[in-house]
Amino acid sequence: GESMVRQFLWGQRFTRKYFGYTSNCFWLPDTFGYSAAIPQIMKGCDVDYFLTTKMDWNDTNIFPYDTFYWQGIDGTKVFTHFNRTHCWPAPDDLSKHVYGKGKNGSSIKERSVTDRRLISFGYGDGGGGPQFEMIEESRRVADLNGCCKTYYTTVGDFMTDLEQRVKNPSTYAGELYLELHRGTLTNQHN
């Protein structure tokens, strides 16, 4: 816990000094499970929102939520969003993920809570970021008839807007355990 608090504090100090802002988001896209102490640490460091992607990889129990409040050990809650949409901003990919037309169905688990999705794009596992084609395609589909409405935003603004728009989000208490990579950074060994 102490190491994580230091990382938050030094990270916030760095972004304030060199970029002029304080982040309100904790985004861990490629991590194999999350301690139930994280919400308390986040709130203590003025970080309100948590985002990740891999919880959809569970191989035994499907995690029930993608937009919810995560409650830590001490009862502290942080608003959480799982980005289950991994695609370019191409019209057919967006339709598959958002409207459930692909082999895996919709990337939205609880439409009664929200129908909004953060679509992050670019090459991540090796750097590279977004390519010109991805940015251009995103621009072109922004108002394309028959495609879901898209727009550019910051992660912090997306999360703030999402929290204001959700309807009756669930609360999940405890560790976020990723079954696919059992025992990594958790207290569960089997």
Residue ranges of model-derived segments:
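Catalytic-domain carbohydrate-binding cleft regions of carbohydrate-active enzymes
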Residues: 1-190
